[in-house]
UniProtKB/Swiss-Prot annotation:
GO function terms (MF aspect): chlorophyll binding; electron transporter, transferring electrons within the cyclic electron transport pathway of photosynthesis activity
Cofactor note: Binds multiple chlorophylls. PSII binds additional chlorophylls, carotenoids and specific lipids.
GO cellular component: chloroplast thylakoid membrane; photosystem II
Primary site of residence: plastid
Function statement: One of the components of the core complex of photosystem II (PSII). It binds chlorophyll and helps catalyze the primary light-induced photochemical processes of PSII. PSII is a light-driven water:plastoquinone oxidoreductase, using light energy to abstract electrons from H(2)O, generating O(2) and a proton gradient subsequently used for ATP formation.
Subunit: PSII is composed of 1 copy each of membrane proteins PsbA, PsbB, PsbC, PsbD, PsbE, PsbF, PsbH, PsbI, PsbJ, PsbK, PsbL, PsbM, PsbT, PsbX, PsbY, PsbZ, Psb30/Ycf12, at least 3 peripheral proteins of the oxygen-evolving complex and a large number of cofactors. It forms dimeric complexes.
Protein name: Photosystem II CP47 reaction center protein
Amino acid sequence: MALPWYRVHTVVLNDPGRLIAVHLMHTALVSGWAGSMALYELAVFDPSDPILDPMWRQGMFVIPFMTRLGVTKSWGGWSITGETITNAGLWSYEGVAATHIILSGLLFLAAIWHWVYWDLELFRDERTGKPSLDLPKIFGIHLFLSGVLCFGFGAFHVTGLFGPGIWVSDPYGLTGNVQPVIPAWGAEGFDPFNPGGIASHHIAAGILGIIAGLFHLSVRPPQRLYKGLRMGNIETVLSSSIAAVFWAAFVVAGTMWYGSAATPVELFGPTRYQWDQGYFQQEIERRIRTSLDEGLSLSEAWSKIPEKLAFYDYIGNNPAKGGLFRAGAMDNGDGIAVGWLGHAVFKDKEGNELFVRRMPTFFETFPVVLLDKDGVVRADVPFRRAESKYSIEQVGVSVEFYGGELNGVSFSDPATVKKYARRAQLGEIFEFDRATLKSDGVFRSSPRGWFTFGHANFALLFFFGHIWHGSRTLFRDVFSGIDPDLESQVEFGLFQKLGDPTTRKQAV
């Protein structure tokens, strides 16, 4: 009878050679997917407008990860920052994709070799002649090598000592570029938005990993601990590895969703909390106040606001606005942003400035309400016109634009004022091209949302996997009904007297 599908991995349980083969093949698939996905994204990516149509609006998933590690140029002659490039070198987007695909091919061949030549002397215990692995020693080797890699990344790549550095930006995602990072060794290194912490933590964790690896290579575990934690069982390795992976997945889901120096706004889009807290709106207001204090007019002050900053202050870029099961990039939802119309200022007929109440994240529709500076409702778009007291028509609301494409233009006809009041609910007002991609007008999430959703789900799945395999290996004797140390004693015909090791029969 064949193995059921959920037990097929038992074929590599006591077969170290083929255990290596399947891991090589898995790594080949991961590397091959990464390279292929990068080439696909590069084929559909439009780099022409990094301000209003950045990578995260186009639904790019692997390009942002390459960019944050220092890859910014393409063999196609463009750069992520907008410049024209003549010589991108090997480590361009296409170069990184190609090296992943080449690595995938080499790993594929290595997997086949190890599957065919599975029975190596290296995997056999000299004393018993049976297949066995010195798992504590292998753990030490892996810990040492990963420590070297971790230290090297922090000390050389991130710092620019031998490498490009990483993507570093200001708190508002306006000035991002790749640059070397100085390690932060003080308390400031624990600030999740400080890129210096990335360098220092990799250096520190790498040194710790190297020391721990050398310790496990030179010191054998006590026999009681070895048996208690089932260190001789490969399923123990599986369980603890799953634990490491699910913990990492939970951590990166958090750093992605809440934001950090490792997940910059320019590469992954804003977080939902930046909309909820009016983060970009407050920065825009601060800049306007500063400009007005310098003697500039309101029109001049708004004209100084970067279009990039205004675009962040738009609800359509909030990753929590797109439903998890709405497939496609943000551009497939509200469309490709074409231009900022300017900041809309509403006034009633008495000259009082009115502010449109913004839509909260988890609303699809929201009443259009205009308040004065004291928070008192002065105008609205009523549901029942017969009972209205504050309608746009009754209050005599007008709108004037400052900055952007409609700078200095004003409207007073109620239909137009209502149109812009509805759009002002969504933050700064932009013009969108919905024809090119046949965009349906329904908001989509950004790669920040997809990454978080995927990693949180897999982390939960792997958490249960850790519990499952940990229980199996710790309580194997209970589940099987036989103490693993008594297997030979209950084997029929091995002893003249069952279970008496002093009466072992000799092989003829």
